[in-house]
Amino acid sequence: MQVSDLFIREMPSDCLPRERLLAIGEKALSNQELLAILLRTGSKEADVMTVAATLLKQFKQLSYLQQATLNELMAIKGIGQVKAIELRAAIELGCRIYQSSQIKFGKVTSSQQVAQRLLQEMKGLQQEHLICIYLNTKNDIIQQKTIFKGSLNQSIAHPREIFREAVKYSSARILLAHNHPSGNPTPSPQDIQFTKRMEECGEMMGIQLLDHIILGDSGYISLREENFFASE
């Protein structure tokens, strides 16, 4: 018996997803196999494929896994701090790659177009995220940034932070969007007040606020389309 034959037969199952990726490519692998590759090894209680399956069962959807905290990941048997950090880093990198591919050379043609993209991008977020999209005079996207995470009710969002970036990018226009974790996109009095304040600041600086979009679970509300802008 050849030593190499013995090694192949006794190769741990942990290695199989990597071998399959080499043989057939990453697109043919299941979510469980891709997670197993990121995790690399299992534990004494469970092999890596079992740990990956437990992750998928625990969070049910990849969009829920995207929002998993370090502590939530570490609550899974077989995932320690190092593995949790590596998973969070991989997830964040994937989000940034997706976001970059969506905004590069893009053009804003309507609030609906922006809302449809952001609904997918911000799905499952447990906190309010305020997004600002910076545009040139032709409505080409220059940059997209998350201004803050929290709640507009807490008065965290300050026009200074938003317009400082607008000046930095030489933006002619901006478009704001934020999600309602409750799933209901109906604007609150604070949302309306914040929008009017941003519109006034934009007028003083010569930077137009095109719209403020509020995102729910499966729909959105455009404050401009709903006539909440003073310029309407």
UniProtKB/Swiss-Prot annotation:
It comes from the Bacteria. Keywords: Hydrolase, Metal-binding, Metalloprotease, Protease, Zinc. Zn(2+) binds at residues 178, 180, 191. GO terms for biological process: proteolysis. InterPro entries: MPN, RadC_JAB, RuvA_2-like, UPF0758, UPF0758_CS, UPF0758_N. CDD domains: MPN_DUF2466 (cd08071). It holds the Pfam family RadC. Belongs to the UPF0758 family. NCBIfam families: PRK00024.1, radc. This is UPF0758 protein EF_2926. It comes from Enterococcus faecalis (strain ATCC 700802 / V583).
